[in-house]
Amino acid sequence: MIQISNLILAADVSPEVAGSSGFNMIASFFAAALLIVIPAAAFLIFVSQKDSLERTSATRRR
């Protein structure tokens, strides 16, 4: 079984480049979470809470 370090050396990729690439990939995951996932989740929670309040007030009117 080929170890990761042997695979990186066989591909002529320096450890610095591989580390930088890995760091940038993880940083992009965090950026995506901040820019897309968290606002979308907040919006969905807001809408579901608002809908719940509207349904509650609608049942009180009956």
Swiss-Prot record:
Give the keywords, sorted: Membrane, Photosynthesis, Photosystem II, Thylakoid, Transmembrane, Transmembrane helix
Work out whether the entry's keyword set contains Transmembrane helix: yes
Q: Name one GO biological process term.
A: photosynthesis
Q: Which InterPro entries match?
A: PSII_PsbX, PSII_PsbX_type_2_subfam
Please state where this protein is localized: Cellular thylakoid membrane
Q: Which gene encodes it?
A: psbX
* Membrane topology listed for this record: Single-pass membrane protein
Its subunit composition reads: PSII consists of a core antenna complex that captures photons, and an electron transfer chain that converts photonic excitation into a charge separation. PSII forms dimeric complexes.
Instruction: Identify this protein by name.
Output: Photosystem II reaction center X protein
